[in-house]
Amino acid sequence: MAGYKPVSIQTYPVLGEKITQDTLYWNNYKTPVQIKEFGAVSKVDFSPQPPYNYAVTASSRIHIYGRYSQEPIKTFSRFKDTAYCATFRQDGRLLVAGSEDGGVQLFDISGRAPLRQFEGHTKAVHSVDFTADKYHVVSGADDYTVKLWDIPNSKEILTFKEHSDYVRCGCASKLNTDLFVTGSYDHTVKMFDARTNQSVISVEHGQPVESVLLFPSGGLLVSAGGRYVKVWDMLKGGQLLVSLKNHHKTVTCLCLSSSGQRLLSGSLDRKVKVYSTTSYKVVHSFDYTASILSLALAHEDETIVVGMTNGILSVKHRKSEAKKDSVPRRRRPAYRTFIKGKNYMKQQDDILINRPSKKHLELYDRDLKNFRISKALDRVLEPTCTIKTPEVTVSIIKELNRRGVLANALAGRDEKEISRVLNFLIRNLSQPRFAPVLINAAEIIIDIYLPVIGQSPVVDKKFLILQGLVEKEIDYQRELLETLGMMDMLFATMTRKESTSVLQHNTSDGFLENNKIES
């Protein structure tokens, strides 16, 4: 008796997303390290100088973490209430932060007590930054004002009162000492010049502004608010270049890659989008477990840190390139291994024993081997099989049809079992790779269960969905045939014109030749 031959499962190429250089680059991070903070992480900022520590603002504390440490190496807790927006100076030696009580505090990284305290705001300060000369601080608060402070003298220099709602974000120019930008809940983004004591450019974002980012060159400005990320050309007076709407909820933070070629945005929809700064299309996306409030990238994009509303700090480090020398070389077999048995001489009474290889059969193959056709079909109709490997289910249906027992395997099923079969047909009937097999199976099911249609509302609903799917597929086929007919007509017309022009050309040449002969 011949052995059982397992069912041949036809495999198909997986149609995944296109692998690009951005996909490889942004996927090259290790498994994230999660750190629990005391409250929602409202700001993350990396030091511009080595060793590239980063400051995390959460609740009433500011933690300084080493680049690869999971415990804070320093903590600033001299706040009466919630702390906001801790930001490093360009040299990485000073840190400035706002607070809920309206104060602005300046810290030395090597100390604990604040070096300076700037008092002047009457409400919470959500935005602070250092100017390009390193000796001034810009702050924006919920009292609708923007203030410029002098660090050496601890005095207020200027106050701007052009916003009509909370000032929640801001940044200073990296090139010009006198220019800085603020965003407000009054839907406007304003660029101020300390030399004129007023704003020089004002743009309308259209939503409460949560974050602003000025490119290092100072020519482009990015604003985030609502579901929109907008890019403005400041060299053309604040002209809108592009409006991006790729998030489903409010965008809360912005960040620029080290090369300046990629823009990152974080949102309450728990996603971080990566945009190209040339085409402004999404080139990659990160998913997180909670709504995102803050985002920062380390030097050379070696580390990406994301702060979330649930107090979780997610830290991803880039994978290090494995050295070839570090991989242990496989030991080569000894010489005697290759010459083993070379000089062996066969004898007349030797007995050759073949050890048959044991074949492992899948459960559905075992059922088919023992002619349990209904049980084999039940196994491949399990959700784990129909969703992950539908080609296995289709192959078993095809094998049962080849044996002529598909009708027997489908008959005698209750409401739940026939619903599973119909669900699989509805999900995969329109796929070209499965259509020939499943259409035949659908016809057999209709023939078997046509007398009992109308007795079960659940089954009747499935049949109606299947009917609508078939009608839609017929409409698609009709439209495709009409399109093919129009294309055939166009091709035929073009071919006729070309042949006519060739005949006319040949006729004219012959006429000229005859005239020449007669003359």
UniProtKB/Swiss-Prot annotation:
Main location group: nucleus
Keyword Repeat part of the UniProt annotation: yes
One Pfam family matching this protein: UTP15_C
Coiled-coil intervals, chain numbering: none
Subcellular location: Nucleus, Nucleolus
Cross-link (Glycyl lysine isopeptide (Lys-Gly) (interchain with G-Cter in SUMO2)): K249
One Gene Ontology biological process: positive regulation of transcription by RNA polymerase I
InterPro entries: U3_snoRNA-assocProt_15_C, WD40/YVTN_repeat-like_dom_sf, WD40_repeat_CS, WD40_repeat_dom_sf, WD40_rpt
WD repeats: 36-75, 78-117, 120-159, 162-202, 204-242, 246-285, 287-326
CDD domains according to UniProt: WD40
Keywords linked to the UniProt accession: Acetylation, Isopeptide bond, Nucleus, Repeat, Ribosome biogenesis, rRNA processing, Transcription, Transcription regulation, Ubl conjugation, WD repeat
Top-rank lineage group of the source organism: Eukaryota
Location of N-acetylalanine modifications: A2
GO CC annotations, alphabetized: endoplasmic reticulum; fibrillar center; nucleolus; small-subunit processome
Function: Ribosome biogenesis factor. Involved in nucleolar processing of pre-18S ribosomal RNA. Required for optimal pre-ribosomal RNA transcription by RNA polymerase I. Part of the small subunit (SSU) processome, first precursor of the small eukaryotic ribosomal subunit. During the assembly of the SSU processome in the nucleolus, many ribosome biogenesis factors, an RNA chaperone and ribosomal proteins associate with the nascent pre-rRNA and work in concert to generate RNA folding, modifications, rearrangements and cleavage as well as targeted degradation of pre-ribosomal RNA by the RNA exosome.
Subunit: Part of the small subunit (SSU) processome, composed of more than 70 proteins and the RNA chaperone small nucleolar RNA (snoRNA) U3. May be a component of the proposed t-UTP subcomplex of the ribosomal small subunit (SSU) processome containing at least UTP4, WDR43, HEATR1, UTP15, WDR75. Interacts directly with UTP4 and WDR43.
The protein's name in its UniProt record: U3 small nucleolar RNA-associated protein 15 homolog
Species, as recorded: Bos taurus
Organism lineage string: Eukaryota, Metazoa, Chordata, Craniata, Vertebrata
Name of the gene: UTP15
